């Protein structure tokens, strides 16, 4: 019963799509009608500007943290309950019932979830993801790699139930990224050079 309650708490908080909130309140626009049509951080940032993308990301991180903290204090930090809460947020964010089950891809959500679950392993996974973003110049494959790696780590160190939950979340992300994955392997994927972007911001790009 604890696990079900945790899942439900996560799902309903996950339904809060800050991409929709930010763009509709401040820009009076619907992000699903622009760019990739995805109500998530990347699309908002790409179409409307980095400021709005960052604001969206902060909102998605906040709802994830809220769900995890609620479950943490209700069930005294039980890891299995936290796993279900995180999965619930991923499900709610990816398949919100009020938006015809069309949501975001869950990168920000999963990033905070894995750090909250095990901050050392989570940070290592994110650093690996960042390294892959830099060398691959791609934003699709790295989050899938770090989530798969974290799933394996969790399975080995915390048992098959925990590992399976994170693996399910990884499969959800793969489903949400399915078009981007095809584009990547067919050479149509968008290239993002993070180092060049940083250098431009610092005014040292030549």
UniProtKB/Swiss-Prot annotation:
Record-level GO BP terms: phospholipid biosynthetic process
GO terms for MF: acyl-phosphate glycerol-3-phosphate acyltransferase activity
EC numbers on record: 2.3.1.275
Subcellular localization: Cell membrane
Class of the enzyme per the UniProt entry, highest EC level: transferase
Keyword Cell cycle: no
Membrane topology: Multi-pass membrane protein
Regions crossing the membrane: 7-27, 54-74, 81-101, 114-134, 155-175
Pfam families from the UniProt entry: G3P_acyltransf
GO (cellular component) term, any one: plasma membrane
Known catalytic reactions: an acyl phosphate + sn-glycerol 3-phosphate = a 1-acyl-sn-glycero-3-phosphate + phosphate
Pathway recorded for this protein: Lipid metabolism; phospholipid metabolism
InterPro entries per the UniProt record, alphabetical: G3P_acylTferase_PlsY
Primary site of residence: membrane
Subunit structure of this chain's protein: Probably interacts with PlsX.
Cited HAMAP family: PlsY (MF_01043)
Protein name according to UniProt: Glycerol-3-phosphate acyltransferase 1
UniProt organism field: Lactobacillus johnsonii (strain CNCM I-12250 / La1 / NCC 533)
Upper taxonomic lineage: Bacteria, Bacillati, Bacillota, Bacilli, Lactobacillales
Name of encoding gene: plsY1
């Amino acid at each position: 019963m604890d696990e079900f309650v945790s899942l439900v708490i996560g799902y309903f908080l996950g339904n809060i799509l800050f991409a929709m909130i930010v763009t509709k309140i401040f820009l009076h626009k619907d992000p699903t009608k622009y760019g990739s049509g995805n109500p998530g951080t990347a699309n908002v940032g790409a179409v409307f500007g980095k400021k709005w993308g960052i604001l969206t990301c902060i909102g998605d991180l906040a709802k994830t943290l809220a769900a995890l903290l609620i479950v943490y204090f209700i069930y005294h930090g039980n890891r299995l309950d936290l796993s279900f809460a995180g999965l619930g947020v991923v499900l709610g964010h990816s398949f919100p019932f009020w938006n015809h089950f069309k949501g975001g891809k869950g990168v920000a959500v999963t990033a905070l979830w894995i750090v909250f679950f095990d901050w050392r392993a989570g940070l290592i996974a994110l650093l690996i993801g960042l390294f892959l973003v830099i060398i691959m110049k791609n934003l699709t494959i790295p989050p899938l790699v770090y989530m798969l790696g974290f799933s394996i780590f969790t399975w080995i160190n915390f048992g098959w139930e925990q590992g399976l939950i994170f693996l399910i979340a990884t499969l959800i992300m793969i489903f949400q990224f399915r078009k981007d994955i095809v584009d990547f392997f067919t050479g149509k994927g968008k290239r993002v050079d993070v180092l060049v972007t940083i250098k431009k911001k610092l005014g040292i790009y030549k």
